Amino acid sequence: GNKEWTTANIPKVVGGIDAASTAVAQALYEQIVSTVVPVSSPRVAEMVKLLENTFRAVNIGLVNELALMSHRLDVDVWEVIDAANTKPFGFMPFYPGPGLGGHCIPIDPFYLSWKARQNGFESRFIELAGHINAGMPQFVVERVVSALSQNRKPLRDAKVHLFGIAYKPGVGDVRESPA
């Protein structure tokens, strides 16, 4: 799904149960990938992956909330994102959509949140992003119904074509796709 970043050039984080197992994992992955990042334990390696995926989910939730807000304020959220992206530092663009999809982004943040609850910590930010993202398919449907109504087209007579139902461009994987 990404021509620039492949298995070979995406850094691989490894953490073994001790220094020897970390070294073995590192030696194995160095045969396949260009950069291996050793960490102190499997727990740290797992938390790295959870952070990466939760970061995406939370930022998608933020931009989805901005899309909802911009719709109410009659502001083009895409123009806002494009203009904000001209700042050369401190901004990373995320784009609104029908929610989260794929085999890890929709799952990992909620595993992390569940694990936090198991240890007496409430991760409100992650849960809120999940709530916002979970509501996006309904928002998309409401927008379609509204567009049909504005064009005096009854929903029951409408033919709506869905394009791009995979969770990201360039892939055929529809796991957890909100579309």
Enumerate the predicted regions with their spans.
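Structural/interface elements that position substrates and couple domains in central-metabolism enzymes
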Residues: G1-A179
